[in-house]
Amino acid sequence: MAANKTLPTYFCRNCENPLALGEDLISKKFVGASGPAFMFSHAMNVVVGPKIGRKLITGSYVVADVMCSKCGETLGWKYVETFDLKQRYKEGMFVIEKLKLTKRY
């Protein structure tokens, strides 16, 4: 019988503000400005900045920077709109850089 492993909660590395739940983790295969990044379907305790056009590895998007609501640290971005139908699944998702996170079980 497999052990029942609980999912982690992800926190801002700078101020310990809770940002995302393990059940909302979609992928660990993203790349941010500082290296590896995680995609989440939902994020909490964040401030979403203004929409901007940005060219990323997989194409052009409308994104918004995402900051911690407690300390103001820039964490990553939110996909607002894509122009490629194959990438449409990303719309509304949050990408947070691994170096900006800590996790606890």
Swiss-Prot record:
The keyword tRNA-binding does not apply. Residues 8-105 form the Yippee domain. It holds the Pfam family Yippee-Mis18. The keyword Metal-binding applies. One of its GO terms (molecular function) is metal ion binding. Zn(2+) binds at C12, C15, C68, C71. It comes from the Eukaryota. PROSITE patterns: YIPPEE. One of its GO terms (cellular component) is plasma membrane. Disulfide bonds: none annotated. Keywords: Metal-binding, Zinc. PANTHER family: PROTEIN YIPPEE-LIKE CG15309-RELATED (PTHR13848). Belongs to the yippee family. This is Protein yippee-like At4g27740. The lineage of its organism: Eukaryota, Viridiplantae, Streptophyta, Embryophyta, Tracheophyta.
